[in-house]
């Protein structure tokens, strides 16, 4: 099999995958009917899981609260990086704006809304306490109050604590604290429980991330989509496990974990609840007709009369920055989803970042990383191009064999192999060097696709966002031209039909890259350009060696 066939098969596989993804979007699989015995939606919008209390043989289903939800009252908390809205009904975070990340290049003054509670799109971070009343679980309603409606972290402050005060009907005084830190997207959420009653209190601490189904991008059947869905980490068992929305619709997750984390992911951004490393929790997922939830429920919490207890968790609302996520919890950085080659992608990103600290431009960083990769594989590429040059020189002899034996494929094949042996040409010599490089190219591809640092990062001229498509589509056209030049340098395929297909590939890939992020297209342009120069140089050098020797021999 020669390199042309490999390229052709890879292109067809990529097209098939894109068409399949488009089909799945337009004709999704039928969703099973939700099992209402597994979960219930409370009147305040919380989904509560199925649990097994210590004194029960069968699971207990939490049922909806009978008390109607009161009108919403939000308090606003603003730091240097976050603008958060907290609903006083249950102390849920229902708004989360990322101040350092504009919505788009055109809307620089509008921060990106990671969390929101709109009718069309809901994505909130809930936390609550609930109890078991016999065999009937109930979510506690504290109707929190706060001293102010607006809190702001001052420039000279390193920390801001927002306290909500509430009281339950059974004599529980609760202070719900939110601790914000300067320059951080991590929020500490603590319940300070004081049992002012005369009997033992026993309950559970519940955290969850709830969002409605995201809208699919149908702008192109070749649209590249990053993973959007839930995930979790169960230390010692699953470092990083995805739970897609379709998985939630089919069955509910039920995992016992010590430490770990739960998360909702989307392209570039992440929300995650991170329990204490020594706490034991049950991770679960639930799905309704509109909403998907991943949550964590603690082991039973007991507070004796006249005693206090603190329970809590940490909530991350922010960008998927590898170095930041590593410091929060083990394996949380894996949500920067580089795929199966994550270890190689991590090395390449570290190299890109090191170059960026010097040049100060992510576009030039992409260019220089591509150059370094080409230099690292120079000898392998040279072997491949030398093999191609040898094959090109054999084309007249191969054509003569085809004309001599006509339709006798067996004789053509035998004569071709004898010719290869006689000329000391390995027809597979151009394939192996290319195959060795493919993992590196794939790893860099995912670095360019997943790194939030490239979001709205400018390059030069009209390219003001390396994570978005070229608005004038100049880069895809240049990329297509480089592919066409590369094909002209390669030996022509023996099969006329294959030759026509190969000539069509530059047009096909131009359309494929039409809406690709500019950073990805830039990488392919630089890579193709360097390949053209290297192939031209090696082919020219190799082709001129033997004629030069013949001239010298004749002169003698």
UniProtKB/Swiss-Prot annotation:
Q: Does the keyword Protein transport apply?
A: yes
Instruction: Kindly state which keywords UniProt assigns to this record, in alphabetical order.
Output: Cell inner membrane, Cell membrane, Chaperone, Membrane, Protein transport, Transmembrane, Transmembrane helix, Transport
Q: Tell me the superkingdom of the source.
A: Bacteria
Membrane spanning stretches:
6-26, 332-352, 358-378, 428-448, 501-521
| Any one GO molecular-function label of the UniProt entry | membrane insertase activity
**Gene3D superfamilies annotated for this entry?**
2.70.98.90
Write out the annotated subcellular location: Cell inner membrane
Keyword Mitochondrion attached: no
Biological processes, Gene Ontology terms: protein insertion into membrane; protein transport
Membrane topology, as annotated: Multi-pass membrane protein
A GO cellular component annotation here is:
plasma membrane
Q: What job does the chain carry out?
A: Required for the insertion and/or proper folding and/or complex formation of integral membrane proteins into the membrane. Involved in integration of membrane proteins that insert both dependently and independently of the Sec translocase complex, as well as at least some lipoproteins. Aids folding of multispanning membrane proteins.
Subunit structure comment from the entry: Interacts with the Sec translocase complex via SecD. Specifically interacts with transmembrane segments of nascent integral membrane proteins during membrane integration.
Family note: Belongs to the OXA1/ALB3/YidC family. Type 1 subfamily.
Protein name, per record: Membrane protein insertase YidC
Specify the species.
Legionella pneumophila (strain Corby)
Q: What is the lineage of its organism?
A: Bacteria, Pseudomonadati, Pseudomonadota, Gammaproteobacteria, Legionellales
